């Protein structure tokens, strides 16, 4: 049997992390079994579905490289198929027309609730033989079995059973002729030959209804697996107050897709004590029986740790392709300065996100207007003039501009003046970067370049002279 899974988001908003994890699990299960992964857009909610949301879902899937083998299919383009199946069910007696008014249904609901009963349709039209005009408004309901139960073996939660007496005669076509969500899902899974439905636990109550419709259609019933929800680190349902929720917001915040995928796969699934997984390892090891039934807690610090790991573990050239977007957001002109791959090597240990990296690299490419006030006050003092003049001259004398030779020039300055490296290094750092923090000074000065470094040292010397004149 060829394994076929699907991810079927409703385009009413962005791709959130819960949806992304569901998509990842479905994708991994298909890839693990050499099967196929289908993308289906469930856009039957015409009022809330938007083209922008569809684009956001696609962007998120593409950024995570969760490529699909079929689709995207759109439910709104399949209404003729759904209605043909409903008409067939009406002929076979597995569905019926319901003419009950909203007023009657509301009165029925209130009566049942007053008695402490679960509100459900009483089946009046199911057994009615009244004649109605062809143009009289009606809905179509599924004639749910009235006896027995629905049992399915959830691949994560184990056997789950629902009594058919608890289930309503579901509306499958509205008065305007449009099919309903639960029905469209059934026909889609049937037509697309979906073998395994992996989705959120909020769909558990839909499953027995969908199974009954599939059986009425004499269609194969897929295997179901319902993934637990994701909570914030405070135990409450994940929301915007816990930080980013949209997948693309994590891109904007400077996370690599590999970090988010690695984090999401471990958010409810485990393989021994292993924390770091390549995409190939995820595919190799993923199984549904290793997915936890319990809700997971989203921990941003853990994601940040993973992101820092991947910034340094992945090839710098690859990381640079993602960094480029953030550089553009900061409007930094990188034509005069180190290659971005070299920048990743320089700043990788210091920066936990690509956004942080982009925001802290400008001095490598562009001159700064002024020195950081605190750093200048502390390190650009008259006592720093001589170390800066000596190190400037030694840097100017370098013919082979390497980080090693830059280091020798700084060390030689400290030796010549008989001072500690800090007496040379800190004024030099503020002079060439404008701030009090940077990567190792030799590689920083080397990356900034000989001409620009000397110009900035002269600017720092002018700054010191101006301060002296003002005193």
From Swiss-Prot:
Cofactor note: Binds 1 zinc ion per subunit.
Span(s) of short sequence motif 'HIGH' region: 9-19
PTM statement from Swiss-Prot or TrEMBL: Phosphorylated by HipA on Ser-239 in the presence but not absence of tRNA(Glu). Phosphorylated protein cannot aminoacylate tRNA(Glu).
PROSITE patterns, sorted: AA_TRNA_LIGASE_I
Phosphoserine modification, residue list: 239
GO molecular function: ATP binding; glutamate-tRNA ligase activity; tRNA binding; zinc ion binding
Location relative to the cell: Cytoplasm
UniProt name for this protein: Glutamate--tRNA ligase
């Amino acid at each position: 049997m060829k394994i076929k899974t699907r991810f079927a988001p409703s385009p009413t908003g962005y791709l959130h992390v819960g949806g992304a994890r569901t998509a990842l699990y479905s994708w991994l299960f298909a890839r693990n079994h050499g099967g196929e992964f289908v993308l289906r857009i469930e856009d039957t909610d015409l009022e809330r579905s938007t083209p922008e949301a569809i684009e956001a879902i696609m962007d998120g899937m593409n950024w995570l490289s969760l490529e699909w083998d079929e689709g995207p299919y759109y439910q709104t383009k399949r209404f003729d198929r759904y209605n043909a199946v409903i008409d067939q069910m009406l002929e076979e007696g597995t569905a019926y027309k319901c003419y009950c008014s909203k007023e009657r249904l509301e009165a029925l609901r209130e009566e049942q609730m007053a008695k402490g009963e679960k509100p459900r349709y009483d089946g009046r039209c199911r057994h009615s033989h009244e004649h109605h005009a062809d143009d009289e408004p009606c809905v179509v309901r599924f004639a749910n079995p009235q006896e027995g139960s629905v049992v399915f073996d959830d691949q994560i939660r184990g056997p789950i059973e629902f009594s058919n007496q608890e289930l309503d005669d579901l509306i499958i076509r509205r008065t305007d002729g449009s099919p309903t969500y639960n029905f469209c899902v059934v026909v889609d899974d049937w037509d697309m030959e979906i073998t395994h439905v992996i989705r959120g636990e909020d769909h558990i109550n839909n499953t027995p209804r969908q199974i009954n419709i599939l059986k009425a259609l004499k269609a194969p019933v897929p295997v179901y697996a319902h993934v637990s929800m994701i909570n914030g680190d405070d135990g409450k349902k994940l929301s915007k107050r816990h930080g980013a929720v949209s997948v693309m917001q994590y891109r904007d915040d400077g996370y690599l897709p590999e970090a988010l995928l690695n984090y999401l796969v471990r958010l409810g699934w485990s393989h021994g004590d292993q924390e770091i997984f390549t995409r190939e390892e995820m595919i190799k090891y993923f199984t549904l029986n290793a997915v936890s039934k319990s809700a997971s807690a989203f921990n941003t610090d853990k994601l940040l740790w993973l992101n820092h790991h991947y910034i340094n573990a992945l090839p710098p050239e690859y990381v640079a392709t993602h960094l480029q977007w953030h550089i553009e957001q900061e409007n930094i002109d990188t034509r005069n300065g180190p290659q971005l791959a070299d920048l990743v090597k320089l700043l990788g240990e210091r920066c936990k996100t690509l956004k942080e990296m982009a925001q802290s690299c400008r001095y490598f490419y562009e001159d700064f207007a002024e020195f950081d006030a605190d750093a200048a006050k502390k390190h650009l003092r008259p006592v720093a003039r001589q170390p800066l003049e000596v190190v400037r001259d030694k840097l100017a004398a370098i013919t082979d501009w390497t980080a090693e030779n830059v280091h020798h020039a700084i060390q030689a300055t400290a030796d010549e003046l008989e001072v500690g490296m800090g007496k040379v290094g800190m004024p030099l750092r503020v002079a060439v970067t404008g701030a009090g923090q940077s990567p190792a000074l030799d590689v920083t000065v080397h990356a900034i370049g000989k001409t620009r470094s000397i110009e900035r040292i002269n600017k720092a010397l002018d700054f010191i002279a101006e301060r002296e004149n003002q005193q």
